Amino acid sequence: MQPMTARFDLFVVGSGFFGLTIAERVATQLDKRVLVLERRPHIGGNAYSEAEPQTGIEVHKYGAHLFHTSNKRVWDYVRQFTDFTDYRHRVFAMHNGQAYQFPMGLGLVSQFFGKYFTPEQARQLIAEQAAEIDTADAQNLEEKAISLIGRPLYEAFVKGYTAKQWQTDPKELPAANITRLPVRYTFDNRYFSDTYEGLPTDGYTAWLQNMAADHRIEVRLNTDWFDVRGQLRPGSPAAPVVYTGPLDRYFDYAEGRLGWRTLDFEVEVLPIGDFQGTAVMNYNDLDVPYTRIHEFRHFHPERDYPTDKTVIMREYSRFAEDDDEPYYPINTEADRALLATYRARAKSETASSKVLFGGRLGTYQYLDMHMAIASALNMYDNVLAPHLRDGVPLLQDGA
């Protein structure tokens, strides 16, 4: 007879925010046993953070993660697992040896053009400079950007950064890649304008561990779902699967590979107390190979970090090769056509095998953390809870 401990009511593949939200809700709200399987040696997906050993400074291993949302339900939900600091994210942009206030606003415009502009004067200036190209006539990303903010600002702050991000001349990128380039006609340089913002007081990993702390949740690290599903599913034949890994990988790339961008990081401990005076500095010029530098001490000024050492991380962007970590969907027309075929496969997999697909990788969408959590709460409410509680048949939500 199958021992009770081996039986589960739900399998969750991946322990990022989507997977952990599903696991936590199903375990605590429905009193169900959940097994979370994680390929990596740690919990939390790309939100994982750890203390750098020499300094104790918390480093976001997969690039800076800033929590912000205007969704009250998400904010109330996440505060069950962590308190938040009052951190407000601000970014600066390095161009030609000068650091500019970012995003584009009165601070940047006044700095860049060498004198103060009132909101009205700045609007007029940018309208005049953008008049060079009509947005409707823009044939590529470069022309579209110039039609929105004018050539001087485009060449200083968009051209090089975009070329580095996409490894492609902006003249070769489709105009549709950008819908808007917002300019704020105020001195407000908060990066996000959401109602709620902050960083988890004890760090991301503590928050993620708290989400998985319920005794009805088991997390197995260093475990690839595709290696163990043949053993696990027969022992719990009624248990659905929530899969948050790459959508194309699930189907063994049968239709081809979806395109992603990846990031490379260089972490360095420097023998100084402060390297750049701010958490994130964008490097907008093409002659600098990285896109930005993170300095993690500035995320937590309330912490007692060493005054003689600091940790920086240089970030580089490139197209993902087969074995790279996927970060951002490229979303070309070919990708979208491929996605439609995989979505159709996902829908039939849900119907035939009780597998649901969610999260950034599982849906081929760029999701901020709060969006992944909101999406998981919706899947729980509309699909999983009705199925596990009332026996309603599973349907891939939104497919």
Curated annotation (Swiss-Prot):
Listed A to Z, the keywords are: Cell wall biogenesis/degradation, FAD, Flavoprotein, Isomerase
Q: A single GO molecular function, which one?
A: flavin adenine dinucleotide binding
Cross-referenced InterPro entries: UDP-GALP_mutase, UDP-GalPyranose_mutase_C
Q: Which GO terms describe its biological process?
A: Actinobacterium-type cell wall biogenesis; capsule polysaccharide biosynthetic process; cell wall organization
The record's function comment reads:
Catalyzes the interconversion through a 2-keto intermediate of uridine diphosphogalactopyranose (UDP-GalP) into uridine diphosphogalactofuranose (UDP-GalF) which is a key building block for cell wall construction in Mycobacterium tuberculosis.
Q: Which GO terms of the cellular component aspect does the record hold?
A: cytosol; peptidoglycan-based cell wall; plasma membrane
Q: So what does this thing catalyse? A: UDP-alpha-D-galactose = UDP-alpha-D-galactofuranose
> What organism is recorded for this protein?
Mycobacterium tuberculosis (strain ATCC 25618 / H37Rv)
EC numbers: 5.4.99.9
> Quick one: which residues bind UDP-alpha-D-galactose?
157, 162, 166, 191, 282, 292, 328, 366
Named cofactor requirement(s): FAD
Q: How does it assemble?
A: Homotetramer.
Full protein name? UDP-galactopyranose mutase
Task: List positions binding FAD.
Answer: 18, 38, 46, 66, 224-225, 360, 367-369
Q: Which family does it belong to?
A: Belongs to the UDP-galactopyranose/dTDP-fucopyranose mutase family.
Primary gene name: glf
